[in-house]
Amino acid sequence: MKALQKVILTAVLLLTVNSYYSQSKEYTELYNSITPKLQETAAIKQKFYGKEFSEFYKYLNNKGLKVIKLSYLSVPSNMKKINVLELNFLNDEQQYYAYKNKFAEPYIYIFLLDEIPQEIRAMVFNTHGFWNEDFAQFLSKLRIEKMEFHGLEGISNRYYTKPR
């Protein structure tokens, strides 16, 4: 009976370790597929300054970069005016895995020249922040002031020194 317990315990431990390495490999592959495209985009970000969001979004799609989630911010934070978008390229599970393992998470802050209409609050709330084409249409005419790219300095460099 004790031998059976040891075999079961060993099997459970091996499956757990295998699952961890599988997830780690999966996240590494995802990170390595996203970041080179974002690094390339960061290098030419000024090209989109003053342009409408729709132009930048079309570029992301053409690069195969799929926005998964978004959130919004006010800068400075004491303003009621919403003028910053955060675009994320990971789903909740991937973000949690990255956070738990202290891995970098690639995302973009987009500072807008135009105020984002207050309706964005309800849209984000109703979709739990998951991106859909309604957001693309809603934000399409807003002009980009500047962008910051985060999480591109390597998978294990969670606390980056400065954005691109």
Task: Give the role of each language-model region.
Residues 25-164:
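Residues within mature, well-folded domains
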